[in-house]
Amino acid sequence: MGKARGVNNGVNESSLGYLFGSGQPSSAAAATMGTTTTTTTTTTTDGTGGRPITTTTTTVTDNKKTSAGVRGSPNNYFRSEGQNCGNFLTDRPSTKVHAAPGGGSSLDYLFGGPSPAGSGNK
């Protein structure tokens, strides 16, 4: 008899298990998550016809990946004014707006604003 719809035996766990299941990886997947183990077996002889020598080497490699939103670069330090302030990386001037809303603008000459004081226009 077939399985009921939506029931999973845990062998081929869906990556969307957090939506349809417990959200926890199976114990076998949790034990191996983030690491890779490689075992190499080498058999050699000393050339005189003696007993073969078997050597086994096991290597464990850490495969941790950085999740989204986790700061991984030492240059990405916390900035109280936001991530795009200052010339910390590009050595260019800031594009931060310095005039108050409704206040003076350096673009008044384009939009017919008041002329700067002392310009001689009356």
Curated annotation (Swiss-Prot):
Would the keyword Phosphoprotein turn up in this protein's UniProt record? Answer: yes
Q: List where Low complexity composition bias occurs.
A: 32-61
Keyword terms of this UniProt record: Microtubule, Phosphoprotein
Family classification: Belongs to the SPIRAL1 family.
Spell out which residues are annotated as carrying Phosphoserine.
73
Q: What does this protein do?
A: Acts redundantly with SPR1 in maintaining the cortical microtubules organization essential for anisotropic cell growth.
**What InterPro entries does the record point to?**
SPR1/2/3/4/5 (IPR039613)
Q: Record's superkingdom?
A: Eukaryota
Which BP terms in the Gene Ontology apply to this protein?
A: cortical microtubule organization
For this record, an example GO cellular component is: cytosol
Give the span(s) annotated as Disordered. Answer: 1-78, 96-122
Q: What is this protein called?
A: Protein SPIRAL1-like 3
Keyword Phosphoprotein assigned to the entry: answer is yes
Q: In which tissues is it expressed?
A: Ubiquitous. Preferentially expressed in above-ground organs.
